[in-house]
């Protein structure tokens, strides 16, 4: 069985601690997808470029895309792989296995219809290695900034995974009263709820895509999604 673990930028502020969490989950064939939202925002702040989000997705012009590439590939990716190696995990950084189309609308260089190259990823997994994938996609004419949750779902579907695990700094999906929803088989119902907003929107869309693509179990923090989407 194969699983995908997606780890967000907030947890990657401390790579060693993040790897301890990954280590407890990475039994058997495991691929890692990482974001870097906090690191991207910090890099943009250094150059006085504002961060704008629409429906939980970062609006990405040329200046922002340059910062995304620098933060993800030059900072986060390198630090995470180093931390994985130090913990004895057989990490292999891989870039170029995610493709996307440019998303229509006001987002700029943001990818949609994300898909992953299962052949290349399986070649790494079959050697007993752990592919580590940043959330940058190859577009038709340029690199594209892609949502980490959507990327993780695409990788999980391509690899026909049994599990997709989102490691996040939030406890899980919360209801209108602020309590964590422990189990659900209906991400559509939650997407329609008024209490779901911000970054949880793309996360639940990713849960939906993964379940519809055949992933049997998806976990967001303490919230477990299982069954038909």
Region spans (language model):
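C-terminal catalytic "cap/lid" subdomain
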Residues: 1-229
